[in-house]
């Protein structure tokens, strides 16, 4: 493996509630737009509850120039089931590939790393519930064996597709990508682990280009679980680091980023958004839903990213925080930041994007760094929405108004996920 190889970003594909594609997303970011809706959930025709969500409006997979025959093949394989999260993923990949201007048709030089927490799970749960109810209603004396056979008959394909390699397969086949491939599921930090994996693949010389992509389409079942843990805000507004923070809400979305060997990018005169400098990662191995507040794993991940990037804390211009908006996670994150950068510092600037786009779960870190890199190229730091008063106990300052500055050159993206997956990555602007 050559540590001297440089890896750069040559294409981005954001898809979320504030836009489809880099231009629409950036314009919404500058104007502090959001699209939060109250989603009503039903089982059959029975109303079971409502939850706030950052919704993608007017999404149509047919608008992205993806081969119609391939889309029909996927639809047939999925037996006409709802496959929105896969469509989000495919749309994001197409946006990024087109943006990169790379020839991706049948490339053995291009790899693919995909992230998601549980593709197809919500649809599968609904299918099992609906069919179980109909079977039981039609025959209340049914044996357990007969019940199993009937459920298996209607749900076996859906169950098979819960295997994450199928999500990767559908994506790679759609775009004829034949290089290194991997599916990453490290909770909220999946996107950062995926980026690091892609970078190491390029540095090892296995592929010149690797696409990293992810998506999530959270629904009522995830809301019931996480809401039951007290993690979802009641008013629909995520308030990161605020004194009155009370949880998050979900956001539809997907994202893709094209990572490329620097020399290869230069040889084809590709546009370079930014360069990957380094990453740091730790695993707490403590609790599933709580961070290890008594330890310093998150801080260690950040320090590792700075060391690998060969920059000191004062060389970071922007911190893009996880900013989940919950009491304990924001406290844990703030402590990791202040342990390294000090208390109530003016620089680096701290921002976070969940108030704009919601929590995209398994794809949140990837979506957020993609949007942050778009903003970085535009010399813009978005303000933290809904944070009228920072919790003084956190001892940090956040960006309250949008900042334009050509001095913004490096960004540190940090994420702490369920299960104790902590990640931090550093990028620098492509023209510096």
Task: List the predicted regions and their residue ranges.
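ACP-dependent fatty acid/polyketide chain-elongation machinery
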Residues: 1-75, 263-275, 370-385, 423, ...
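Condensing-enzyme catalytic core mediating Claisen C-C bond formation in acyl metabolism
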Residues: 6-10, 33-39, 49, 236-309, ...
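Conserved beta-ketoacyl condensing-enzyme motif
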Residues: 9, 33-182, 215-221, 313-331
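Active-site pocket-shaping loop/turn-to-helix segments
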Residues: 23-24, 71-91, 155-160, 181-193, ...
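Acyl-CoA/ACP chain-elongation machinery
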Residues: 37-43, 206-241, 245-246, 279-293, ...
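Short, well-ordered amphipathic alpha-helical segments that serve as non-catalytic structural scaffolds
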Residues: 88-100, 167, 261, 294-310, ...
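Active-site-proximal alpha-helical scaffold in enzymes
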Residues: 89-102, 164-175, 181-214, 250-270, ...
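Glycine-/small-residue-rich "gating" segment that lines the acyl/pantetheine channel
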Residues: 136-152, 196, 200-203, 217-267, ...
């Amino acid at each position: 493996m050559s540590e001297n190889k440089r890896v750069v970003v040559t294409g981005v594909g954001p898809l979320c509630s504030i836009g489809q594609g880099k231009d629409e997303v950036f314009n919404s970011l500058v104007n502090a737009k959001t699209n939060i809706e109250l989603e009503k959930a039903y089982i059959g025709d029975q109303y079971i509850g409502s939850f706030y969500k950052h919704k993608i409006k007017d999404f149509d997979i047919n608008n992205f120039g993806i081969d119609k025959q391939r889309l029909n093949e996927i639809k047939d394989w999925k037996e006409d089931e709802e496959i929105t999260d896969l469509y989000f993923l495919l749309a994001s990949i197409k946006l990024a590939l087109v943006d990169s201007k790379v020839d991706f048709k049948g490339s053995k030089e291009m790899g693919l790393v995909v992230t998601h927490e549980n593709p197809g799970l919500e649809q599968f749960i609904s299918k099992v519930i609906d069919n179980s109810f109909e079977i039981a209603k039609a025959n209340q004396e049914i044996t357990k064996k007969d019940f199993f056979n009937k459920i298996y008959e209607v749900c076996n394909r859906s169950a098979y597709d819960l295997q994450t390699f199928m999500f990767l397969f559908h994506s790679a086949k759609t775009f004829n990508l034949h290089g290194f491939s991997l599916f990453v599921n490290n909770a909220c930090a999946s996107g950062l682990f995926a980026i690091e994996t892609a970078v190491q693949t390029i540095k090892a010389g296995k592929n010149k280009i690797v696409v990293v992509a992810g998506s999530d389409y959270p629904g009522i079942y995830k809301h019931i679980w996480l809401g039951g843990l007290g993690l979802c805000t009641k008013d629909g507004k995520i308030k990161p680091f605020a004194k009155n923070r009370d949880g998050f809400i979900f956001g539809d979305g997907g994202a893709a980023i094209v990572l490329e060997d620097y020399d290869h990018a230069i040889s084809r005169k590709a546009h370079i958004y930014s360069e990957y400098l380094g990453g740091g990662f730790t695993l707490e191995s403590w609790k599933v839903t709580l961070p290890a507040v008594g330890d310093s794993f998150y801080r260690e991940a950040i320090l590792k990213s700075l060391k690998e990037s060969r920059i000191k804390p004062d060389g970071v211009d922007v911190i893009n925080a996880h900013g989940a908006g919950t009491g304990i996670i924001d406290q844990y994150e703030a402590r990791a930041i202040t342990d390294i950068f000090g208390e109530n510092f003016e620089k680096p600037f701290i921002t976070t994007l969940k108030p704009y786009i919601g929590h995209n779960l398994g794809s949140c870190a990837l979506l957020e760094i993609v949007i942050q890199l778009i903003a970085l190229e535009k010399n813009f730091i978005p303000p933290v929405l809904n944070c009228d008063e920072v919790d003084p106990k956190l001892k940090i300052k956040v960006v309250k108004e949008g900042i334009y500055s050509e001095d913004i050159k490096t960004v540190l993206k940090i994420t702490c996920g369920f299960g104790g997956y902590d990640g931090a990555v550093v990028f620098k602007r492509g023209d510096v």
